[in-house]
């Protein structure tokens, strides 16, 4: 991406998903130490399992490394067994939270309306939501990818985010763990469509909202992807589990 005086710093977000026991904290410490030695051009965040969030936040406190939750509930409290509220994420030391990740939408049937509720709750708790959108292979092959994703953006972002910090992550489901790769042209086309919708919804603020790419970003492809127009960072999955790989992506900027 090309930075200007009004463009926020890029964001490289490492989503550990359902991976990581206590020993994984050593990987986070290694990332933090490397970023202290050489401050990054981007903001960097790790999203560990909820069981590690508090300990990881303490382990990297004061470093150039943010932490966040992989999900939050739309309610602040109540009879929601197994769920975590946005306030709990913040209380554990997180400053960001992922809302509507493709695996949450697929595995748990989360709708865009529910995602919007999560994003609203996150912002109200002082967290920065990363709202995820993306299409399946079937939708893309039907020629409906752009219209589908734009609709997701529209329905997943509550108007209450106006004036609040948030970002959008584009996850092409067909390029995650399938062996398929989204071309830079695919990425640029979709990010441009998302940008247009953001400007339509949020006016000038929509011009500076970061749009992250989240389709199997790895050290080998990070530089090309991060240099593409309208790509404001990356939502990284498996490659964020090892400090060496994650740092290579961070340093690609």
Curated annotation (Swiss-Prot):
Which enzyme class, named as a word? isomerase
UniProt keyword list: Cytoplasm, Gluconeogenesis, Glycolysis, Isomerase
Chief localisation class? cytoplasm
- Please tell me one Gene Ontology term that the record gives under cellular component: cytosol
For this protein, the record's PROSITE patterns field holds: TIM_1, TIM_2
Enzyme Commission code(s) on record? 5.3.1.1
Q: Which Gene3D superfamilies match?
A: Aldolase class I (3.20.20.70)
Annotated substrate binding sites: 15-17, 177, 216, 237-238
Biological process annotations from GO: gluconeogenesis; glyceraldehyde-3-phosphate biosynthetic process; glycerol catabolic process; glycolytic process
Catalytic residues, chain numbering: 101, 171
State the SUPFAM superfamilies in the record.
Triosephosphate isomerase (TIM)
Per its record, the protein catalyses: D-glyceraldehyde 3-phosphate = dihydroxyacetone phosphate
InterPro entries per record = Aldolase_TIM, TIM_sf, TrioseP_Isoase_bac/euk, Triosephosphate_isomerase, Triosephosphate_isomerase_AS
Where is the protein localized?
Answer: Cytoplasm
Q: Which residues form a coiled coil?
A: none
Q: Which pathway is recorded for this entry? A: Carbohydrate biosynthesis; gluconeogenesis; Carbohydrate degradation; glycolysis; D-glyceraldehyde 3-phosphate from glycerone phosphate: step 1/1
One Pfam family name is TIM
Give the Gene Ontology MF terms in alphabetical order. Answer: triose-phosphate isomerase activity
Does the entry feature the keyword S-adenosyl-L-methionine, yes or no?
Answer: no
Which NCBIfam families is this protein grouped with?
Answer: tim
Q: Which family does it belong to?
A: Belongs to the triosephosphate isomerase family.
- Tell me, what does this protein do in biology? Involved in the gluconeogenesis. Catalyzes stereospecifically the conversion of dihydroxyacetone phosphate (DHAP) to D-glyceraldehyde-3-phosphate (G3P).
- Indicate the quaternary assembly: Homodimer.
User: Know the name of this protein?
Assistant: Triosephosphate isomerase
The organism of origin for this protein: Caulobacter vibrioides (strain ATCC 19089 / CIP 103742 / CB 15)
Classification from the root reads: Bacteria, Pseudomonadati, Pseudomonadota, Alphaproteobacteria, Caulobacterales
